[in-house]
A protein has these predicted regions:
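Hydrophobic scaffolds flanking metal-cofactor catalytic centers in soluble metalloenzymes
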Residues: 1-197
């Protein structure tokens, strides 16, 4: 069982931006709920996106963000939140409503739910395909398993699941790509799957 220090999601009216900024600077994630639009206010570590923040953006399917240049939120990341995702992040805020701090430590044990293998786009690195070839599994680099997307090679998915997923098990676990190995416990996808069980 591993302890994971993860951000707490909170919702704020834009009139209380100072509270939201303090929450985010302490490591949390904020949902700013304006009358006409909603946006996320997220931490930045000297221009870099913290790992669990990046995974939250991937889980939501949002890629674009701006770094706030001036004012109290200067240096933080601002992400437009489409209407279709509002209910989703509000679920996260509701889940985290009982936490008084901006970060929470959770003891997480893998429940083998395979959420890390669902609804994720796995980019391959050249080392992954080299490892497959070295292990006599060069066919894993073929069209049945890999496709091109935006100039990158990625694992194929079938009905939202990784092509290598067998039930809740990885069919190539010992040879899985480096990005699969790096998937963090405590990501929003992981936490959501745990809450549903």
């Amino acid at each position: 069982m591993d302890d994971v220090l993860r951000p707490v999601w909170r919702t704020y009216d834009p009139r209380f931006e100072a509270n939201a900024v303090a929450h985010v600077r302490a490591g949390g994630h904020a949902v700013m709920r304006g009358a006409a639009r909603w946006w996320l206010l997220l931490p930045s570590d000297e221009g870099m996106i913290p790992e669990l923040t990046a995974w939250a953006m991937l889980d939501l399917g949002v890629g674009g963000f701006d770094e706030v240049e001036s004012g109290p939120a200067a240096g933080l990341l601002r992400v437009k939140l489409p209407k279709r995702l509002r209910e989703h992040v509000m679920d996260w805020c509701e889940r985290d409503g009982g936490h008084a701090t901006s970060l929470v430590s959770e003891a997480l044990d893998c429940r083998a739910c395979a959420m890390c293998c669902r609804k994720n786009r796995v980019q391959l690195e050249p080392e992954d395909e080299t490892r497959w070839a070295d292990e006599g599994r060069a066919e894993l680099s073929g069209e049945a398993y890999v496709r091109e997307s935006r100039g990158r090679r990625v694992l194929r998915v079938l009905r939202g699941d990784c092509v290598h997923l067998r039930g809740n098990d990885c069919g190539i676990y010992a040879l899985r790509p480096d990005n699969c190995r790096a998937f963090p416990a405590g990501s929003e996808g992981c936490l959501s799957a745990r809450a549903e069980r």
